[in-house]
Amino acid sequence: MRSDVIKKGIERAPHRALFKAMGLTDEELDKPLIGIVNSFNELIPGHIHLRRIAEAVKTGVRMSGGTPLEFSTIGICDGIAMGHGGMKYSLPSRELIADSIEAVVRAYNFDGIVMIASCDKIIPGMLMAMARLDIPAIFISGGPMLPGRFKGEYVDVKTVFEAVGAVKAGKMSEKELKLLEDFACPGCGSCAGMFTANTMNALTEALGISLPWNGTAPAVYAHRIRIAKQTGMQIMKLVEEDLKPSDILTPEAFEDAIAVDMALGGSTNTVLHLMAIAREAGVKLTLDTFDEISEKTPTLVKISPAGKHFVLDLYEAGGVLAIMKRLSELGLIHEDRITVSLKTVGELLRDVSVLRDDVIRPVTRPYLSRGGLMILYGSLAPKGAVLKVSAIPDIETFEGEARVFDCEEDAVKAILSGDIEKGDVVVIRYEGPKGGPGMREMLAPTSAIAGMGLDRDVALVTDGRFSGATRGLSIGHVSPEAAEGGPIALVEDGDLIRIDVKAKRIDLLVDEEELKERKAKWKPKVKEVKGYLKRYSSLVTSANTGAVFRE
């Protein structure tokens, strides 16, 4: 066993003494030691219940002859960090999580590891560590939140964000907003729509590193506890077989995950996260990989913010495997690859049925003939930008005058003050990985635009990123970012910007000579940052490579 290095032989008597100080017996130390990474905290609705999940996992480990040992890592709620300086720490926390798990697992030489998380950056941080460590491992989430109910309609946290703009526009009273606030999020779990957290949870199934139903079984359902127990039992089988992440996280696994992502109309953040996980797994992904797969993958699902359904509906429709079953009809799924279930994808799909065609459409009548995410290039984004086409109105081209802001706060103030007009292109820059630093999510401005009824008439372009709850003509991850002197740094108020969805282009319609003059005068915008953000800014690479640390 891997763990023998810390528990076998007379030289390890001091080590055993320390384990015994925690109540462990010789019998427990003779068994495989399974690390349980639990990101429980009292700060995130998706993590508040993870102690219960961890206890069920540990029960499963013990049932199958292992000794579970739990430790923790950090987590940030993007919703609570949204719209202020705290969001600068969200994406950077991904690297901290990966590094912290690596440190503990290497120090203790576990025989296997179970990773428990529910929300945005914690999941990819854990999967990065999983790929890096390459010991038998399995992931389980805490499950999605149920949608709330307000005035006879299902709602979620996105509804509340957009309601702020509605109040400012006089379309909703503050009293109604308070009631909505009370009813929108009825309990624990990752937010009820297909935002970043639930997209990533779905993709753990598609990648094959979690058990069936992990991506969609609700947080409060007993099914979630059963999955947790099964996960604890399954890690023991993975240890016995010595099946490692490198056996599962293959190029084909990432291709399948991207196909599922596109069929789901998933969060734009998945582009960053899948590239980061793939890098740790030694698999090369580029923006073009995403676009190539998106071009041949139909959008089969529209879950909030793109449509009226929620993750609960997807669960009732058959879950992630039901989407993969549909995609397999088009030859878009590699059915011979192995998963943590110790079954191939094809074996898992054999008995799967789609239970609700209204949620997962047949491939013969998709919402879109292509996938939900699109990569744009052009003079404003020479190295690429990302658009969630599944969450935009039927717009093929948009041309408007730039309204330029050097931070999110200034843009939100202008939007809520009524200073943004129909036809404007809101440009928010110096919010990239280096320039923010931290690449904040722009949910506050996009929600304000949508809440004020301008989502068909105003575009937003940024070198920052977006929440999975964002909808409308919102283009993020513009690369190179402003802090690196990218073209977005040279945009001035009144410049024309043209977005051509059909041609997959975003262009700054300014004379080349004029841009050369502006470039000659440009100076980097210096921000005073300290501590981790200062180190992060010095190490992080561009969004078009996943905003990972340079080698």
From Swiss-Prot:
Pathway: Amino-acid biosynthesis; L-isoleucine biosynthesis; L-isoleucine from 2-oxobutanoate: step 3/4; Amino-acid biosynthesis; L-valine biosynthesis; L-valine from pyruvate: step 3/4
Disulfide bonds listed in the record: none
One Gene Ontology molecular-function label: magnesium ion binding
Residue positions binding Mg(2+): D78, D120, K121, E441
GO biological process, one term: isoleucine biosynthetic process
Keyword Lyase included in the entry's annotation: yes
Superkingdom, natural source: Archaea
Cofactor note: Binds 1 [2Fe-2S] cluster per subunit. This cluster acts as a Lewis acid cofactor.
Keyword Metal-binding: yes
Residues recorded as bearing N6-carboxylysine in the entry: K121
Residues where [2Fe-2S] cluster binds: C119, C191
Signal peptide bounds: none
EC number(s) reported in the record: 4.2.1.9
GO cellular component: cytosol
InterPro entries: Dihydro-acid_dehy_C, DihydroxyA_deHydtase, DiOHA_6PGluconate_deHydtase_CS, ILV_EDD_C, ILV_EDD_N, IlvD/EDD_N
Location of the active site: S467 (proton acceptor)
Family, as annotated: Belongs to the IlvD/Edd family.
UniProt name for this protein: Dihydroxy-acid dehydratase
Gene that encodes it: ilvD
